């Protein structure tokens, strides 16, 4: 993969995570001085890192995989080799997980110099990122396997991922939500 492709592939999602951290952390952080005894930007940083992992893995195994399957017909070409369909799907899982984990690790590296990594336990974050990214890569690929056309991803993104992102407790304490909203968040 060339440098330009890497930048076009990884850059926008990484910039989006940095933008969330800067806009929400510094913007709302100017009004919300602390949450649970820490600064607002410190509060949201781990959640933004986790969301970068989630969205990176999901994007790779939803829209991007759909295009590889139905538009570019990469899967058809791959199974004409000694690879089985299972091999190709596992490769998609692993690439989606790799991409999601890369976002998390790079984002963690950006957080550290700004004092947003509060514990040495953060050294285990890459492992958590890989597990989370693999989980979301499998979820994305599973949905993609049932999608008949690319418009079906609107349901997946706006009906499942966006509520999960917004109700997950990234931007405000999860326990402060009403009971019905906490149920949505736990789902």
Describe each model-derived feature in a short phrase:
Residues 85, 89-158, 162:
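Alpha-helical transmembrane segments and their short interhelical loops
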Residues 3-69, 116-125, 151-155, 176:
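Transmembrane helix-boundary elements of multi-pass transport/secretion proteins
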Residues 60-64, 68, 138-145, 176, ...:
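Membrane-spanning helices that line or support transport/gating and their immediate boundary helices
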Residues 28, 144-187:
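Transmembrane helix segments
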Residues 27-28, 32, 65, 75-78, ...:
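Hydrophobic alpha-helical interface/terminus motif in multipass membrane transporters
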């Amino acid at each position: 993969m060339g440098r330009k492709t890497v930048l076009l592939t990884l850059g926008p999602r990484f910039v989006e995570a940095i933008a969330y951290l800067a806009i929400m952390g510094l913007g709302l952080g100017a009004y919300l001085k602390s949450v649970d005894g820490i600064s607002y930007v410190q509060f949201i940083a781990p959640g933004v890192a986790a969301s970068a992992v989630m969205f990176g893995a999901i994007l790779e195994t939803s829209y991007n995989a759909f295009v590889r399957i139905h538009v570019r017909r990469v899967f058809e070409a791959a199974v004409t080799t000694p690879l089985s369909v299972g091999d190709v799907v596992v490769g998609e899982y692993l690439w989606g997980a790799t991409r999601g984990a890369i976002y998390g690790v790079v984002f963690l590296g950006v957080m550290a110099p700004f004092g947003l990594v509060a514990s040495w336990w953060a050294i285990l974050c890459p492992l958590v990122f890989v597990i989370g990214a693999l989980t979301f890569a499998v979820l994305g690929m599973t949905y993609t396997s049932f999608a008949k056309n690319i418009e079906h991803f609107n349901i997946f993104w706006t009906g499942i991922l966006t509520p999960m992102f917004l109700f997950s407790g990234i931007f405000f304490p999860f326990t402060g939500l009403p009971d019905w909203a906490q149920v949505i968040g736990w789902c």
